[in-house]
């Protein structure tokens, strides 16, 4: 998958055409889901693809923002065994499926839900796993202009490049407000990120979707170590924060592995004290 191009053109869709996904494309999405990368390899995941008539009426009132279910021709139900970091893994896996669908011209959207047991009961699922995600899939009613010609990491960034990338991330926090260097609050500038080949990975991670578009992630660069912290606030719950963290890790990893090196996220806190505020929690780190 071309993560750079796919992320640049991805956006959540909540209004779908009454049109099923063609069989060839649906099979490609299902095949990808069976073998897609995981954040934690030894967590067993089961992904059920179900159609409108098997899901919408059953979950209306029980899933979706304030119980208003999103109408879509298809849904992916993510089930997972319960292990350490299984929710972050669900965010990573589920968003990977969304990106693959987008690459194939299929739109998607994460759907909120309150309780795994209720979803399992309403959908009559036979499983020993927990529902960790619901994703709508289909063709969006509104077309969106495609962005092409993403800039490669390590190149010389012109003013036109910067404007193009800035426009693609409109509505997002400025990168320097999201990436710190050496210590918390010390903003990383574009030149430093570019020299370290980290501008693109950070910029694309900045575009990751998040609950209520909170953009809760902050990255701290300490030499070759990248630390990811996520803000805890009253507007969201722990599940949403962990899903958001998993998605951000996927975006960063997808870009940096295409342009610089392979990485391995180490989940959990770090030993060193960086002066991180108490409302932020370190969720992972990696070496580049």
Locations of regions flagged by a protein language model:
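Acidic, surface-exposed loops and disordered segments
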Residues: 1-288
